Swiss-Prot record:
GO CC annotation terms, alphabetical: GroEL-GroES complex
Residues noted as binding ATP in the record, renumbered to the chain: 29-32, 86-90, 415, 497
NCBIfam families assigned to the protein according to its UniProt record, in alphabetical order: GroEL, PRK00013.1, PRK12849.1, PRK12850.1, PRK12851.1
Subcellular location: Cytoplasm
Induction: By stress conditions e.g. heat shock.
One Pfam family in the UniProt entry: Cpn60_TCP1
Predominant place of localization: cytoplasm
One Gene Ontology MF term: ATP binding
Protein name listed in UniProt: Chaperonin GroEL 2
Species this chain originates from: Synechocystis sp. (strain ATCC 27184 / PCC 6803 / Kazusa)
Family: Belongs to the chaperonin (HSP60) family.
An example Gene Ontology biological process: chaperone cofactor-dependent protein refolding
Recorded catalytic activity of this chain's protein: ATP + H2O + a folded polypeptide = ADP + phosphate + an unfolded polypeptide
PROSITE patterns per the UniProt record, alphabetical: CHAPERONINS_CPN60
Length: 552
């Protein structure tokens, strides 16, 4: 397929046009008074959203050269979302401002390479400044971060704070669509295993169709058990201890299963069994997780352990075990969760997570960390209409991601104030730059950092330039509260941003801007010409009557 090629100013102008087209559609969604964007869908009703990344992903421009610019900004938004979970609109606005000011200077004769180098140096300095001013998240700040990121919805803020309190920062919190009108929080405390009881004859509560054990012992093995003789020693020891027994094995069948069911029915031993979760190497790893959490050992021939020699101190223990048809929940004591073994295991899993390139593996590792650390919470989102439901779900996902980012790297004053304070520190840093063009780059960044606050104010119907000047005159945590329309202490007012979100937005915007400024040629696919329309066939004259063809 043939290509379109453009060079120098022409190529950069095309990129800028595409960047502006996408950024102008995204920027209006910024802040608690951000406007909505209606997205037409090929199938179904249009979607009304107030989420920058969703708008960015939908945009495809007809001009291939301009579309290349739009794709670059999509990359900024996607990368920021991937790293910090929020801040996509802020990153887009900063990138647009950097490109606009940068290209203006390149057109005036500035060296693009020197500008890029200056942008990189200043960005590195500003990232260090963000780390220096960030404060750890404490108490009500978690709810405040979530409230701000959800479009100022206090109910969502309180719900996310409650979920994080219950499952800890290592727990898994997921967002699902509910069939009801209400948004609710469900928390599964303890380790959930996606396997249920092997036989319904183990059920202890026939009304609820589940098995409930208090203070059970847990036998964990990767073996398939079919002969009861292997289990007799451990069953006798558990019977003497007078406690329930939960068996987790690859499978239990035949004579072994029948004997366990009979003993349970006769009241000789309170016992139940489930199959080991997962498959292959992951199964061994999950069994080891269960063993570490419950203080037991995995009985495996791989390490020289056999079932007929198991002692009570090799069995795990839990405060409670609940077995349903399809899943099991083990609640370990607080002392077990706080043990050195669990902490070491979580640390090891974090290293595996960092080293993994597979999204699937990362998801599974994160689930394992959550089950060891605290549990799993599900926020079920409800709304009156499908359109409102999707918008609300996007807001809650943003809020959840922002909250996790805040816990990781701390918080800074929100409302674009931190960016204004950073811009004020650039002047003193300029002395460390090598030449005038790098200092021009510093001025470009300083101006670009004002753009998010300017847009926040504009979306609220206020003159952005006036608000920017007022915030510049203020000090410390004083900034513009869009809700009240006043300059006040934003930390005290709960208007806070995760430091990770601000950092990621700045770094990703600077990266793309540097690339655009140093682009000298643009090579894109030439669009295929539209296929000619079919000619009008008219009424196919001359076919009427068809004389002489009469039927006898």
């Amino acid at each position: 397929m043939s290509k379109l090629i453009s060079f120098k100013d022409e190529s950069r102008r095309s990129l800028e046009a595409g960047i502006n087209a996408l950024a102008d559609a995204v920027r209006i969604t910024l802040g608690p008074k951000g406007r909505n964007v209606l997205l037409e869908k090929q199938y179904g009703a249009p979607q009304i959203v107030n989420d920058g990344i969703t708008v960015a992903k939908e945009i495809e421009l007809s001009n291939p050269e301009e579309n290349a610019g739009a794709k670059l900004i999509q990359e900024v938004a996607s990368k920021t979302k991937e790293i910090a979970g929020d801040g996509t609109t802020t990153a887009t606005i900063i990138a647009q401002a950097l490109v606009r000011e940068g290209l203006r200077n390149v057109a005036a004769g500035a060296n693009p390479v020197a500008l890029r180098r200056g942008i990189e140096k200043v960005t590195t300095f500003l990232v260090q400044e963000i780390e220096a001013v960030a404060k750890p998240v404490e108490g009500s700040a978690i709810a405040q971060v979530a409230t701000v990121s959800s479009g100022n919805d206090p109910e969502v803020g309180a719900m996310i704070a409650d979920a994080m309190d219950k499952v800890t920062k290592d727990g898994v919190i997921t967002v699902e669509e509910s069939k009801s009108l209400n948004t609710e929080l469900e928390v599964v405390e303890g380790m959930q295993i996606d396997r249920g009881y092997i036989s319904p004859y183990f059920i202890t509560d026939s009304d609820r169709q589940l098995v409930e054990f208090d203070n059970p012992l847990i036998l964990i093995t990767d073996k398939k058990i079919s002969a009861i003789a292997e289990l007799v020693p451990v069953l006798e020891a558990v019977a003497r201890a007078g406690r329930p027994l939960l068996i987790i094995a690859e499978d239990i069948e035949g004579e072994a299963l029948a004997t366990l069911v009979v003993n349970k029915a006769r009241g000789v031993l309170n016992v139940a069994a489930i199959k080991a979760p997962a498959f292959g190497d992951r199964r061994k790893a999950v069994l080891q997780d269960i063993a570490i959490l419950t203080g037991g050992s995995v009985i495996s021939e791989d390490i020289g352990l056999s079932l007929d020699t198991v002692s009570l101190d090799q069995l795990g223990q839990a405060v409670k075990a609940t077995l349903e048809k399809d899943n099991t929940i083990l609640v370990a004591g607080a002392d077990k969760r706080a043990s050195a073994g669990v902490k070491e295991r979580i640390e090891q899993l974090r290293k595996e997570y960092a080293a993994s390139d597979s999204d699937y593996d990362k998801e599974k590792i994160q689930e394992r960390i959550a089950k060891l650390a605290g549990g799993v919470a599900v926020i079920k989102v409800g709304a009156a209409t499908e359109t409102e439901l999707k918008d609300r779900k996007l807001r809650i996902e943003d809020a959840l991601n922002a909250t996790k980012a805040a816990v990781e790297e701390g918080i800074v004053p929100g409302g674009g104030t931190t960016l204004i304070r950073l811009a004020g520190k650039i002047e003193s840093f300029k002395a460390q730059l090598s030449n005038d063009e790098e200092r021009v780059a510093a001025d470009i960044i300083a101006k670009a950092l004002e753009a998010p606050l300017h847009q926040l104010a504009s979306n609220a119907g206020v003159e952005g330039s006036v608000i920017v000047e007022k915030v510049k005159e203020a000090t410390g945590n004083q900034g513009y509260n869009v809700i009240t329309g006043k300059i006040e202490d934003l930390i005290a007012a709960g208007i806070i941003d995760p430091a990770k979100v601000v950092r990621s937005a700045l770094q990703n915007a600077a990266s793309i801007a540097g690339m655009v400024l140093t682009t000298e040629a643009l090579v894109v696919e030439k669009p295929e010409p539209a296929a000619p329309a079919m000619p009008d066939m008219g009424g196919m004259g001359g076919m009427g009557g068809m004389g002489g063809m009469g039927m006898m």
